[in-house]
């Protein structure tokens, strides 16, 4: 994954940090099942070995996700990857998987006759994707392979033209017209080969070249039929068979074009044979055999072309899925970055990322992510009158108002070079001067304060509620970073931060309250007046802090600001249209006067921006990326890097082992095709040759063997209808590459035996010997004219000599049958090219031994002699035995080795192409699988990371369905228990000395305390609790925030929080014992309704608001060290559950007057 760019791309196995293990366990990865592409079946039971089960697409989206990629696709806008025929669709069975690939759902309904014919018709039709753009990408995807295949085909055809020219010109005086035709064809093929090799060769040109080749082949076929001497319906039959075969396998054309071309070439030969041999008495027999031969060749072509094309399209779908997974992973990375950087500054996030990616040894303490920064200014701002505003708003309006207001503050902070630290209810604080130091940090904070007061004045004007801002600023040093293991939030700590907080508390509404330290950094650029903060805040009075209130900027500062605004406006105008506009997280569309808020930069034009973003189609993005990847990749380089050149085996043994375990789900269909070829061969043999009981027995035995093999292979798919032993046998064959290859070779061998078996039952007596006896001549002196004199003619089945064996007059059909048996091996796409080459040479060698040296050799010699007799009879001329003309053709038994070599070359080239494609597809699929697994792991990690920032139910809300960017999360909770737990004397413990690294060691101990609290809240018994945040040394948690944790009847979520509070007290005692400290905790508990929500859809921060939260905080601040103070409402619930409580009495609470409170002393006595 090193090639991915992203902030966090960790290996999941290395995420062994404490927070990761406690914040959600990784879901066990489900075993991935190889999903075969279900093609229309050749037989009803020949389904995929393991039919894919459709999985509903699960879409997830967070509000901070990339809008262009996760946008909801409108009707008709999404691109489905389902295959379809040009005329017929697969809509009834297609299922779109989450990765975007279309699969065919298993069809368990009974198949009717029309349904089977419908599926059979689909096999013969061209496949294409519904999207024309996707179809073009697919053609580009395999263009390099097709270009290479077409180039090799041109070379083969040049060789074939040379062979035909040799066969025609060697034995007799050639015909000039046919020689010229073959020469022109050779030249054209050479020219086309050069054209195909050019870099400028384009996809559209490939179709033109393919159809030009078909035209040339038709012309050669016509010329060969006219030039044949002597003429016969079977003369040169192997040539059109070869043309038909390469049309399906080596020409890059669609199925429909291949079927039409194959049938056209076949029909052309049949018409020529019928027209040129109309007077032959045996014409019907040979034409019938030719029809069967061509039908078988076309069937082999279809059985080869269909699965090859489907496999290629499936490979394209998987590769596109890989591209989509990669892009999705990149988007996930960006979303993760956006989410993390919304909570943590980049310098902190990068350090945490490095630690997450690196395995760490066990350490005594958790690592602390703290950095020290000097010369910074801290701004605290609080909304005065927020309680009145909240009381007049619904939950949605409150969250919306805070979201809009703080989003505006975030924009102002960015403009004024301030870093937002945290939002605490209605309090907002930021720092200028970190992570990068700035000399004008005090000016930035003052300008930020001025802008915030202006912004709140607009809220006051629109809502009619008297709200205002108190702003306090102090300059000094801070420690910034993250504490704890859960609910990370970036924060700052130091004495100067504490002082800045009190500056806000002691400030005045609508004014900016600063210290002398900040005033010194302002260099007199602002007019000030005494602030008298000590009169309003005890801490300021105790520390004798001199404070000031900003009156306004000096004249010099006003001039500088005016010049700066002018420069910024000029720069903005020059960059208009190049930079994206700021889009708020939500417009004030539901407030009283949205026009006023346009002055804040929030207007309806943001909707147009969102619409422009939504217009970006993620499918188009994937297709565009795929197009660039197709243009950039090099198939030759992939082969060179991963595959051995001749053997086509992987260079890495582990890849070869994985590939050897690859299962072809269409293996049963391959065996069924072999059975079909066998049946065609039987028809040819029965039509042309005499047959005996022995041959019928052999054919019946072969048929039964092949049929049983087909049925055994089908058992694996047909399920529980068969015995377990038979099912195990079927699985052992189909799911093992070695076993299925052995069965495939065995099937081809049976077909080959059926092609040559009849040769041994024919008469093997030489005709020359018989004629020599009758004419009292030596066999070498016998010519065709002598045979004509004694009425020996072609086509007689009766024995010509003594004996009972019948005569086989047309051995060319033995050659044709053997060629069909060899072509049947091309159907088994899973057999390696070397395996097919060896098998072809072995079978061809056996056949040639029989042909040249065995008894069947006389059959071919007799045929050549009788064919010459037939030629003499056709010429109607009379010759005597002395001046008999020589035969004008090469003997069939000498032509056969060359024919076999040509077919073997074509078979090997096709096998190489299929295996090379399959192996490269396997590489891509392996990458796709790895990327999908990594994506799943990263998604699980993202989910844990998300849960570490937002509560699980909130995260689930955003992940449940796709949402618009302006939708907010808000929830009114009727009965929530809230806890504030603070270390009362931590401020006394915290000192900034050189001995403790300016206070860092104090924060290290605080980090350990918070980490202990996080570990406790992660325990199963406290699953109803949710950590909200930490505020300095105060820990905030709540329970009952969602339906799964809210117990309306038993109120168990309330007792769980009480138990947790007591558990924290015990843990603090344990910490004091081991750290030799005397920390004192004060804990306040309250219950009641709250409003929960996420502030800032782009920079999310979960929080809860309401009177319940404020009172709970007061229970903490007015509490007693080492005691847990609760309200009357909580007392009533806990007392009913048997908890031990005591009445403290009446306590004065700020904003609430006097309240009766209680101390929680222990749990139920039982």
Curated annotation (Swiss-Prot):
Q: What is the effect of changing residue 917 to A?
A: Reduces phosphorylation by PKC, abolishes PKC-mediated inhibition
For this UniProt entry, what is the primary localization, expressed as one broad class? Answer: membrane
Give residues annotated as binding ATP. Answer: 382-387, 424-426, 470, 1029, 1103-1105, 1110-1114, 1150
List of glycosylated residues: 791, 876
Residue ranges crossing the lipid bilayer per the database entry: 150-166, 179-195, 212-228, 237-253, 257-273, 287-303, 672-689, 700-716, 741-757, 818-834, 837-853, 895-911
Q: Which UniProt keywords apply?
A: ATP-binding, cAMP biosynthesis, Cell membrane, Cell projection, Cilium, Glycoprotein, Lyase, Magnesium, Manganese, Membrane, Metal-binding, Nucleotide-binding, Phosphoprotein, Repeat, Transmembrane, Transmembrane helix
As annotated in Swiss-Prot or TrEMBL, what is the tissue specificity of this protein? Detected in brain and kidney. Detected in vascular smooth muscle cells.
Residue spans, topological domain Cytoplasmic: 1-149, 304-671, 912-1166
One GO cellular component term, please give it: membrane
Q: Which residues lie on this side of the membrane: Extracellular?
A: 758-817
Query: What InterPro entries does the record point to?
Result: A/G_cyclase, A/G_cyclase_CS, AC_N, Adcy, Adcy_conserved_dom, Nucleotide_cyclase
Tell me which cofactor or cofactors this protein depends on.
Mg(2+); Mn(2+)
Q: What is known of its domains?
A: The protein contains two modules with six transmembrane helices each; both are required for catalytic activity. Isolated N-terminal or C-terminal guanylate cyclase domains have no catalytic activity, but when they are brought together, enzyme activity is restored. The active site is at the interface of the two domains. Both contribute substrate-binding residues, but the catalytic metal ions are bound exclusively via the N-terminal guanylate cyclase domain.
Q: What is the recorded name of this protein?
A: Adenylate cyclase type 6
Per the UniProt record, the source organism is: Rattus norvegicus
